[in-house]
Amino acid sequence: MENKMYFASNVDKNGNTYQAVVDNDNKIVRKGYFLFRWKDQIKMPKAQIKQMIEKYKQQGYKEV
C-alpha cells in the first residue's frame, strides 16, 4: 500500500500550484510547481510547505 501525503498551496498568478509529496515508505520528498493537482491534498501556504519539507529532511528524508 502506498503511504504518501500530498500538500499544495493556492494557485499562483500563472495557474500553477506549489506542491509536495512525502513518500513515507521510501523516505523521499518531491516538491515543485505543477499545473495539475495530485489527489487527496492538504492545502497550506507555500512557506508552511517549505518548513514542513525541511523538517522531513532533518528526519532523514531525501529531496528529489
Where on the chain are the PLM-derived regions?
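Acidic, low-complexity, intrinsically disordered interaction modules
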Residues: 5, 9-55
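Short intrinsically disordered terminal tails
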Residues: 1-2, 58-64
